[in-house]
């Protein structure tokens, strides 16, 4: 029985919290057109992602992909760090 190939969902977002062990909170922003007024508005989603080596810092731009559930609220894992945050 041949299985259909699953499409891997990947998203890019900004790390807003790295206080948990091996977990980061990633803010995903998207623009949606308002159904009545036609204006584009920003919508955002916060996702928890698995960071095995604790390498992410707040402000990093990262790519994450969907995986099996790792915890109650964590079903995404870190793929790579696109851009490092500027050190202050």
From Swiss-Prot:
MF-aspect GO terms: rRNA binding; structural constituent of ribosome
One Gene Ontology biological process: translation
Lineage top rank: taxon: Bacteria
Keywords tagged on the record: Ribonucleoprotein, Ribosomal protein, RNA-binding, rRNA-binding
A GO-annotated cellular component: cytosolic small ribosomal subunit
Matching Pfam families: Ribosomal_S17
Entries under CDD domains matching the protein: Ribosomal_uS17 (cd00364)
Function: One of the primary rRNA binding proteins, it binds specifically to the 5'-end of 16S ribosomal RNA.
NCBIfam families referenced in this protein's UniProt entry, alphabetically: PRK05610.1, uS17_bact
Family indicated by similarity: Belongs to the universal ribosomal protein uS17 family.
Record's protein name: Small ribosomal subunit protein uS17
Species the sequence originates in: Pseudomonas aeruginosa (strain ATCC 15692 / DSM 22644 / CIP 104116 / JCM 14847 / LMG 12228 / 1C / PRS 101 / PAO1)
Source lineage: Bacteria, Pseudomonadati, Pseudomonadota, Gammaproteobacteria, Pseudomonadales
């Amino acid at each position: 029985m041949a299985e259909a190939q699953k499409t891997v969902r990947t998203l890019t977002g900004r790390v807003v919290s790295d206080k948990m062990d091996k977990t980061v909170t990633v803010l995903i922003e998207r623009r949606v057109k308002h159904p009545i007024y036609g204006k584009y508005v920003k919508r955002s989603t916060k996702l928890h992602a698995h960071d095995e080596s604790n390498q992410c810092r707040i402000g990093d731009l990262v790519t994450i992909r969907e995986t099996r559930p790792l915890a109650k609220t964590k079903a995404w894992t870190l793929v790579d760090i696109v851009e490092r945050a500027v050190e202050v």
